Structures are given as C-alpha cells and as structure tokens.
Amino acid sequence: MSAQSQIRQNYHEESEAGVNRIANLELQASYLYLSVGYYFDRDDVALSKFSKFFRELSEKKRDHAEDFLKFQNKRGGRVVLQDVKKPDDDEWGNGTKAMEVALNLEKSINQAVLDLHKIATDHTDPHMQDYLEHEFLEEEVKLIKKLGDHLTNLRRVKAAEEGMGEYLFDKLTLGED
C-alpha cells in the first residue's frame, strides 16, 4: 500500500473510490463506442456517419476517463484501474438499437456522476462538487438530450424497419454533426 499523499486535503476515501469507479465506467463506454463505431464501418453495414459519430464519442469518453484520473492525482487520491469489460455485443444491428444502447449507457454514467456528487456533498467537498457540475454533468445532460433526439428521429423514419430511413439519417442528420 502506498503512503498517504502529502497534498491530500478534504478528500474522502468514498470520493476517491467513486472517481476510480467513474473513470472505469468512462473507459468501458469508450470501448463499447469503439466497437459500435467499427461495426458501422464494416463493408456489410456501411454507415460512415454512424461510424464517425460513435468513434468520436469513444474518444470523448476516453478523454473523460483521463480527466477523472488527473483529478484523482490533483486531489492526492490514488488511481486504481480496473479491468475494462468487453461489450456484451459485437453485432449492433441497426442505428436505432445502437442509439438505444448509447442512451441507456449515458443515463447510467450520469447517475453514477450524480451519486458521486452526493458523496461529495455528504463529505462537504465543494471542490469536487464544482468539478462535477462544471466539467461533467452539463455535458452529460446535453449528450443524453442529443441521443434522445437522434433516437426519436430514427424511430420517426422507421430506421429499424426500413433501410432507407437509416441511410438518410446517416447522411442527412449525422452528416451535419
């Protein structure tokens, strides 16, 4: 076990564990989005904008994980990496299914960040509260809204049933992101 950090101040062990947990969730999300992104890049799927959308999301999630790990070190916590679980699927079906998976995943990440915010509140850690509010919660809410909007539009054009709707969504909606 490593020695206690000399810079650690008002940083509870529960907060430290929560930061490591969320970093792992972000890495798992990154891994899943990478899988989805390259699924849509396959020659038999060929939806390039879906591919780009999910690969960019993968990169953002990896960046978030690194931000949490930097925060951990800045506060005098210890980074403890966990195994990154392989996604349950390798075949993502269609854009509607992929957006549903992404929306559910982002809602669970948002809940984990909210839970960590509560821990910070319970332990009177205004620095962590501010960090979570300004660096993550607003961005998560915006992403959840964007995914929800995409899902609504995919359902509207019956993308899961008709290939043309999914193709047009790929070209016209995701093409503008």
UniProtKB/Swiss-Prot annotation:
Question: Which keywords are on file for this protein?
Answer: Iron, Iron storage, Metal-binding
GO function terms (MF aspect): ferric iron binding; ferrous iron binding
Which residue numbers delimit the Ferritin-like diiron domain?
A: 9-158
Query: GO CC: one term?
Result: cytoplasm
What's its job? Stores iron in a soluble, non-toxic, readily available form. Important for iron homeostasis. Iron is taken up in the ferrous form and deposited as ferric hydroxides after oxidation.
- Family listed: Belongs to the ferritin family.
According to UniProt, the name of this protein is Ferritin light chain, oocyte isoform
